[in-house]
Structures are given as C-alpha cells and as structure tokens.
Amino acid sequence: MLIQELSRQASLDLLARMRLGRLACAQGAQPYVTPIYFVSHLGCLYGFSTLGQKIQWMRANPLVCVEADELVSAQEWVSLVVFGRYEELPDLPEWQGLRALAHQLLKQYAVWWEPAYAKTILHGTERPLVPIFYRIHIHRMTGHRATPEPVSPPDTRVPMTDPGETGWLQRFLRPVRGTRKQ
C-alpha cells in the first residue's frame, strides 16, 4: 500500500463532497467522539444538533477536530482530519442570516437533521429538541490517500547467475570448449 499526503486544494475538494464525519471534542483530559452530518462552505463546516453532551463540551472548549473518510478497501481509502474552532449560531436576530445560510446548505441533503431530531431518552428523561446550528472554522487540515502498490510484471529475463551445469554459462562454454555433456 502507498500512502500519499493530499494537497490543501485536494483536501478541500474532497471535503466538499463528504457529508458524514466524526467530531472529536474534549472536556478536561477526556475526549469524546460522535458522528455528525456536515456541509463544507467557504472555510467552515456547518452542522445541526440539539442540546447534548457534544454541544455542552464544545461550548466549554471550542477547539475541535472532525475526521471524515471514504473507504474502498483496506488498501484504498482517503482520510481527512480538520482542526478548527466551534462557533454556535444562536437563535437571535443578528444571527438569522448565518442560521438561514446553515439551513440552506444543510437542507440539500435528505438526512441533514438526523440524528439530532431523533427522540432521545437519557436517564429516563426525554431530551428537549431545541435546534442548534453551528459552524466549525477550519484552521488547518491534513489529508491522506492510500492506494494499492502497483504490481510489477513478472521478470522474464534470463538470470545472470549460473545455476550449475545446465545454466547459461555452461551452455555457452560447451560449444566453445568442444565438450559435450554425456
């Protein structure tokens, strides 16, 4: 397998067509990873959720990363890791333009609101479904592509080593020396 680093532009192009990733955030020394749907637009990832652990943790520590990948086989895949900063788009008049943009971008995809709007019961209590739009400002990213190593065609050349009495050197020398194998 051959692993190559992607250019920033190749990473951005790939990110533009991806929709599902894994968001990593942390509280203290404890990391947390959860799947998210997102849309990439002008240097940001836009997403939608409801209040829960990831939103609470990102409010406390806005430094996050998102991993997204496409797997073809164990030896053929692409993977991106985006490092950035969480920004909530609150339901306030001054944020309505950005919330509308986030909604416009996300609604192009059939499952943009899942799993946020799925009925969730935690510790016997149903979680309220208050919509939260957010974006992640992309600070940097890494991208890698794995491909199978090309297979070389079989070598059909005669080896230059002489494997003994029947090797190329012996066959060459017999007529020269005038000897024949009995």
Residue ranges and their predicted role:
Residues L2, E76-Q182:
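Charged, gly/pro-rich active-site loop segments
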Residues I55-R59:
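Surface-exposed connector loops and short turns at secondary-structure junctions
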Residues G43-C44, P62, H139:
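Beta-strand-connecting loop/turn residues
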Residues T50, A60-D69, E76-E87:
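Active-site-adjacent structural patch at catalytic or cofactor/ligand-binding sites
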Residues S49-Q53, T147-E149:
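Secondary-structure transition/turn motif
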Residues M18-T50, V66-E67:
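Short beta-strand segments
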Residues R17, Q30-Y32, A60, V78, ...:
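Residue-level preference for beta-strand/loop junctions
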Residues M1-R17, D155, T161:
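Extreme N-terminal tail/first-helix region
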